A protein has these predicted regions:
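Short C-terminal beta-strand
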Residues: 246-255
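Glycine-rich phosphate-binding loop
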Residues: 150, 201-235
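Short beta-strand/loop element within the Bergerat-fold HATPase_c
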Residues: 171-179
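Glycine-rich/acidic phosphate-handling loop/turn and adjacent ATP-lid/helix
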Residues: 181-215, 258
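Active-site helix-to-loop segments that bind/position phosphate- or nucleotide-bearing substrates
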Residues: 1-153, 159-167, 176, 189-200, ...
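Short Gly/Ser/Thr- and Asp/Glu-enriched loop/turn motifs at secondary-structure junctions
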Residues: 178, 243-247
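Short, charged/polar, Gly/Pro-enriched secondary-structure boundary elements
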Residues: 82, 256-258
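Glycine-rich ATP-binding loops of the HATPase_c
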Residues: 235-242
Length: 258
């Protein structure tokens, strides 16, 4: 991970308490979780809960079962069901033009699903909002988007894993402009920007491990390396990284003809 350390125990704090097995299953997308793991859904709630406890997504308390912030962030059916992580949902804003002057109608929305269970759909939705062109190849009409989906996927996955969870009022924001995509991440980097590709510094490691195991982000240290590979293959300008007072922005720019 490349961003400064957040509050260490945030992911172990409780997002919801006093639940029974039915309550846990109602709040977490357990079917989606088992699908991502390519395993059949157990036949009983007790077995499902046991698996969740084993990953520390759920803990057993005297007053019942408790979903941890880790469990909610990764597997929530709706992040908005949990006060502690509701603001951690990814916000997507699509602008008309190259400035913030005009938001396209209906194009300011929040991805309310947990990071793992909603990730593929979220990447697809963001990619679909990027500029595209059509051309005929071998008598077939093909649509080509301005940015490789794999680069967007890696940058977004990195942003989720490396956000500063102690910044309670904000989460990751994706801004799509006509000429660029900006992914804004709460938190500042520990590493110098020019060492993002070559080095790795751990942060939110249990969240990162949970998301890696479910295919949301690349193996440790390879994510931004992969971004460079994908954007070079598409002849895009190098990505940029801008540091604000309490946030980090990664910018992916469109192809510019020489």
């Amino acid at each position: 991970a490349i961003f400064a350390e957040g509050e260490a125990d945030f992911i172990d704090q409780f997002a919801s308490t006093g639940l029974d097995e039915a309550g846990v299953v109602a709040l977490l997308d357990v079917q989606g979780w088992f699908d991502l793991r390519q395993r059949p859904l157990p036949s009983t709630r007790a077995e499902i809960v046991e698996a969740l406890v084993g990953r520390r997504f759920v803990t057993r308390q005297p007053e019942g079962l408790a979903i941890t912030n880790l469990g909610a962030l990764v597997l929530a059916k709706r992040l908005s069901d949990f006060d502690s992580v509701a603001r951690k949902a990814v916000r997507v804003i699509v602008y008309d033009g190259v400035t913030k002057m005009q938001v396209k109608d209906g194009k300011d929305w929040v991805a309310d699903s947990g990071y793992a269970v909603g990730f593929v759909k979220l990447v697809d939705q963001i990619h679909a909002e990027t500029p595209a062109s059509e051309e005929i190849r071998a008598a077939l009409r093909q649509t080509t988007h301005a940015y490789p989906k794999k680069a967007l996927r890696e940058i977004l996955g990195n942003a989720l894993v490396h956000q500063d969870l102690s910044e309670r009022g904000t989460g990751v924001v994706v801004e799509v402009y006509d000429d660029r995509v900006e992914i804004v991440n709460p938190g500042l980097p520990l590493l110098p920007v020019d060492r993002f590709i070559d080095e790795n510094q751990s942060r939110n490691e249990r969240l990162a491990d949970a998301l890696r195991q479910l295919g949301v982000c690349d193996e440790r240290g390879h994510g931004m390396d992969a971004v460079v590979t994908h954007i070079e293959a598409h002849q895009l300008p190098p990505y940029q990284c801008r540091l604000g007072s309490r946030h980090t922005t990664v910018v992916l720019s469109r192809y510019k003809a020489l």
